[in-house]
């Protein structure tokens, strides 16, 4: 397949319309039924959750039933992923997501966008994952610097009935910023919106599809307000010629894109209720939250070159809510009827699940003394476990200091060998490590608020590289890394997504321009830190009265 050089293609944009003009294979005045199914941000959740939610076995049952229904009505199905198959569940991470890709094969995925977390591993791992997958990895806007060539297929062509459908893959150019830089030495991430214009032109000149769809990993931001993130799907849709894409199957921001009103998503979407997708500049935009919690279903009618959406829904995959009864007892109940797990998928995945569990018992490091994480300590005083966790987050983010709720530390680690299971007992919640760049004045305001969190509560803060004296709601002698805070200087703070979004009453920082969600799970970050720094010296992390409350 030959592709036009970028500059030539851009120059031709002014001369050619982006609407498709195919050599038509479809019948005039005939209505075709096309169903697009989609998921995104799978993050290693090939197995059901501890509450029996989602998982690829139930997803296969659901997708199979939809395929059967659509086929009975004379229609066709295309199944797409918005990327980020990697990173999030130890049983998957330890096996380079092999169970996830093999499970996706069995379900019958047609294509996926390459997400930023596909680059959490070296490129050799991603190439191995391509070999496991029986569907193409699409990424139009990543190039090899040394050759100027694309590293992945920019698009794939599918024929459904007599309709020629092109699917483009695009990924956030933030990947270079939030990923591991050692893997990007010869990789260039170009602006996806600009690359989309080039690719659409290439397609219309060379392939002449009837329909063009983009599967993306760029994020959905209400009204295009992307803050410090790179522009997402909304911004791209607005930048393209109207209707040049039939739809964008998105990912990255991990939202149910269910609109409450124009340019505003529902804040707390309830599973099983109606979901109105976004539409910008004649282009539908969809996203199915995360982890396989939903399968998105978009039913289209194609007639005489036009794609019309006639139905859209997010279908929950065994999602449950916690209900407390009058007698005080509580249980988790399904939002919608239960979806049975597919036996063939269970047969495929069970050995991987068992292998992953066994690997959790493997030694990852050691420590020469107790790392104190007991509830009776972390909610009252600074502890060496808190310092180790925050040191790991600081190392991963390049932060100047770190803060987190003591209640997020759930266990101690005894002297001796450390296993991954030990780490997961300390940090079992799967929070994301995040950071924010703030002015010195903002740091003072933030830490003053955090210092109000009282002992004997989960909100009591564990801190690293911070010293102060707190008295009567004010801080004195506040220092970061031993130096007084400069109001005009910029500081980077590492914390967890839970606290960043206001958890435990902490000030929200996820709306700040300098906020970045790294996507890295807290336990994985701690595990890597232990591996790189073992044997740990417990005494080296012992607090020394840096912070005090009078």
Curated annotation (Swiss-Prot):
Bridged cysteine pairs (disulfide): 258-275
Keywords tagged on the record: Disulfide bond, Metal-binding, Nucleotide-binding, Periplasm, Signal
Residues bound to a divalent metal cation 2: 84, 116, 217, 252
Binding site for substrate: 429, 498-504
GO MF, one example: 5'-nucleotidase activity
UniProt-listed Pfam families: 5_nucleotid_C (PF02872), Metallophos (PF00149)
Impact upon substituting residue 538 to T: In strain: CDC 137-85
Gene3D superfamilies membership: 3.60.21.10, 5'-Nucleotidase, C-terminal domain
Organism superkingdom: Bacteria
Sites marked Transition state stabilizer: 117, 120
GO terms for cellular component: outer membrane-bounded periplasmic space
Ranges in a coiled coil: none
Signal sequence extent: 1-25
PROSITE patterns hit by this protein: 5_NUCLEOTIDASE_1, 5_NUCLEOTIDASE_2
Location within or outside the cell: Periplasm
SUPFAM superfamilies on file: 5'-nucleotidase (syn. UDP-sugar hydrolase), C-terminal domain, Metallo-dependent phosphatases
Main localization, broad class: periplasm
Residues that hold a divalent metal cation 1 according to the record: 41, 43, 84, 254
Alphabetical GO biological process terms: nucleotide catabolic process
Essential cofactor(s): a divalent metal cation
Protein family: Belongs to the 5'-nucleotidase family.
Protein name: Silent protein UshA(0)
């Amino acid at each position: 397949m030959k592709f036009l050089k970028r500059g030539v293609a851009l120059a031709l944009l002014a001369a050619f319309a982006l609407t498709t003009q195919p050599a038509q294979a479809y019948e005039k005045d005939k209505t075709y039924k096309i169903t697009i199914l989609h998921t995104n941000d799978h993050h290693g959740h090939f197995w059901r959750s501890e509450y029996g939610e989602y998982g690829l076995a139930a997803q296969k049952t659901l997708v199979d039933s939809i395929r059967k229904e659509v086929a009975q009505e004379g229609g066709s199905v295309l199944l797409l992923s918005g990327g980020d198959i990697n990173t999030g569940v130890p049983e998957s991470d330890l096996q380079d997501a092999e169970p996830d890709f093999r499970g996706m094969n069995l379900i019958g995925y047609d294509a996926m966008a390459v997400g930023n977390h596909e680059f959490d591993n070296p490129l050799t791992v991603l190439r191995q994952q391509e070999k496991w997958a029986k569907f193409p990895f699409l990424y139009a806007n990543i190039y090899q610097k040394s050759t100027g060539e694309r590293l992945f297929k920019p698009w794939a062509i599918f024929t459904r009935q007599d309709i020629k459908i092109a699917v483009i893959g695009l990924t956030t150019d933030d990947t270079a910023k939030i990923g591991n830089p050692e893997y990007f030495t010869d990789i260039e991430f170009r602006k996806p919106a600009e690359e989309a214009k080039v690719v659409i032109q290439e397609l219309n000149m060379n392939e002449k599809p009837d329909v063009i769809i983009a599967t993306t990993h760029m994020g959905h931001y209400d009204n295009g307000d992307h803050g410090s993130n790179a522009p997402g799907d909304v911004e791209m849709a607005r930048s393209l010629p109207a209707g040049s894409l039939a739809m964008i199957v998105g990912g990255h921001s991990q939202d149910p894109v269910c609109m409450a009103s124009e340019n505003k998503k529902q804040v707390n979407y309830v599973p099983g209720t109606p979901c109105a997708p976004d539409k910008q500049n004649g282009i539908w935009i969809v996203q199915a939250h995360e982890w396989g919690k939903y399968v998105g279903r978009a039913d289209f009618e194609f007639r005489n070159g036009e794609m019309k959406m006639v139905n859209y829904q997010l279908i929950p995959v065994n999602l449950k809510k916690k209900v407390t009864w009058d007698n005080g007892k509580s249980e988790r109940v399904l939002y919608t009827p239960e979806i049975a797990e597919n036996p063939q998928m269970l047969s495929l995945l069970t050995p991987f699940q068992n292998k992953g569990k066994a690997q959790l018992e493997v030694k990852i490091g050691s420590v020469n003394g107790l790392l104190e994480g007991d509830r009776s300590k972390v909610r009252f005083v600074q502890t060496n476990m808190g310092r180790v966790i925050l040191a790991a987050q600081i190392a991963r983010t390049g932060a100047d200091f770190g803060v987190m709720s003591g209640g997020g530390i759930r266990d101690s680690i005894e002297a001796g060998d450390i296993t991954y299971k030990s780490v997961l007992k300390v940090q079992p919640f799967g929070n994301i490590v995040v950071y924010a760049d703030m002015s010195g004045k903002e740091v003072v305001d933030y830490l003053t608020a955090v210092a109000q969190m009282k002992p004997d509560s989960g909100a009591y803060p564990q801190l690293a590289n911070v010293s102060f004296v707190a008295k009567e709601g004010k801080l004195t002698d506040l220092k970061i890394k031993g130096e007084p805070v400069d109001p005009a200087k910029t500081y980077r703070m590492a914390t967890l997504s839970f606290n960043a979004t206001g958890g435990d009453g902490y000030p929200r920082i996820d709306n700040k321009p300098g906020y970045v969600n790294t996507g890295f799970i807290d336990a994985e970050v701690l595990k890597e830190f232990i591996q790189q720094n073992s044997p740990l010296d417990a005494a080296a992390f012992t607090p020394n009265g840096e912070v005090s409350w009078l």
